[in-house]
């Protein structure tokens, strides 16, 4: 049956396309895992990735006289990047740190965020137009959009900057954030 599919040019194009989407999705996820320090998981993914890659590449190189196979390979690569990024978004690996500065001094806002389950460090900061509340919030990435919505609901004019921390060590966050469940 596989021989029949491979001899059919449409079947060959579809197989090459699908194989390359799978390969590049694995590649994208592996790179993200590597950047996030998940080296052993990334190494496991790379083993599967290379098996898929060699299979797809051999199909294309064995049939270079058929331009549609090369085009399918290129399209699969582009689609694989998109699919890999979508998968990573769904996995939402790692943590984000959000720095928030309120429009006005609001000492109740950090308490409201803590009640919802977020780890918040807050302080009074001096701005151009007076004192404001500044906060630093660490949360798993899977709660990122929910955190933004919560902050906008509590202070629609709050200024926010988010980034992914490379290293987290010590303090309340290390144990508590891993166990924490954010409330709706």
Curated annotation (Swiss-Prot):
Compartments (UniProt record): Cell membrane
GO cellular component: plasma membrane
Family matches, as InterPro entries: DUF2179, DUF5698, UPF0316
Membrane topology: Multi-pass membrane protein
UniProt cross-references to Pfam families, sorted A to Z: DUF2179, DUF5698
Listed CDD domains: YitT_C_like_1 (cd16381)
Family as reported in the entry's similarity comment: Belongs to the UPF0316 family.
Protein name per the record: UPF0316 protein RBAM_006820
